[in-house]
Amino acid sequence: MTNGDTIESYVPARLDRLPWSSWHWLIVVSLGATWILDGLEVTLAGALGGVLTLPDTLGLTPARVGASATCYLAGAVVGALLFGYGTDRFGRKKLFFITVAVYLIGTALSAFSWNFWSYAIFRALTGAGIGGEYAAINSAIDELIPARVRGRVDLMINGSYWVGAALGAAATLVLLDPRRIPTWLGWRFAFGIGATLGLIVIFFRRWIPESPRWLMIHGRNAEAEEIVAYVEKKILGTRGTAVSDSELFRTRIRTRTHTPWHEIWDAIVHEHRRRSFLGFVLMLTQAFFYNAIFFTYALVLMRFYNVPEQNVGSYLLPFALGNVLGPLLLGHLFDTVGRKKMITITYGLAGILLALTGSLFHAGLLTAQTQTLAWTIIFFIASAAASSAYLTVSEIFPLEIRAMAIAIFYAIGTLAGGVGAPLLFGWIIGTGSITALFLGYLVAAALMILGAVTEAWIGVPAERQSLEHVAAPLSSKGL
């Protein structure tokens, strides 16, 4: 098949009609592990923040702890943009092997850091791998999961970030306990966890096929049909389906080898500008909200509640549990009640709860335990909200630019909300001012409420709809 041929394909509709199966669980586990790895890395950065200020480790200042977190996020931005374009150009499968390899190398090297600059560079490399993973994996998962359950599955996968967070927190209880492992050595062992998990992920991904939707667009529809036929046979056996192909929706496209930059620009800035604004706001607000608290929670507990650094990890466990349960228990509502209503509710409620908690903190009415309980309740809601931001940007743009769109809005949101937040809050905590920290929490809360208002205004009701119905492929124009 040559570039520019017009074809009609049942591939998207056949993927969407498949019943849930063990094959889909393989997709979820092997690709969704990205969020576990990111949760692990962010948690280690938070838990190690206090330890790395000690003279027998790297002797960092609180500001440099925040700066190292910023380097991780900046690396994630560059990785997302670079690998996001590569994912749309060269395929989902090629890139999700490259990105996890970059992550593995970065996190392994982090264990051998000898000063601030080496640590910052290795954290940036680790972030580049994770950022690339977000673009490659989000696009692949959405294109392989049936439309009727895409919302709950995406939220569940994004929520697994907190499985990694819990794993990191539990590990630090042992690795940062000087009675078990010397302080100068324990933090280095912590980074070995991520490298080990990365090797396991590479092993499982060997069985994941290229996205049939990507193959279809790039003139390889015969390969796409073969993959879908194999999956159908694996899942359905000889039973077949109750619906014949002739009754399914046909996707009509003109094949292409790549999407030019001017077409990417036109689609994002002009054709889908309202959706672009929505994605920008949702990603920015949740990134600031999360990173403001998560990259600095260890410093808050140690400075304002006098929690010993080796005990910080234990305070994260209930926090992580609330974050895991939120998407698990609320996820199905995004497919039944609908995207627009649920995103509006979760964003708005998360902002209101943080403002109330900040007021209690400012009034001196919280202890380390009640502060953690409040965070747990807030992020039960906020975790579903943040996960829905990734769900939104991964499904409301055309197939040809899906990974790039994810990368762009992840990058914008992370730069504006994620990179700035740790620096700002690290500096605030360094001043020791409770009032300044309270005002920072109010800013984060206001941003989440802004996200809720924006979703209510221009949100896209994408629940239970094929990706091709939510956003028609660019290659279908004029057909």
Task: Put a short name on every predicted segment.
Residues 1-479:
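Transmembrane-helix signature of 12-pass secondary carriers
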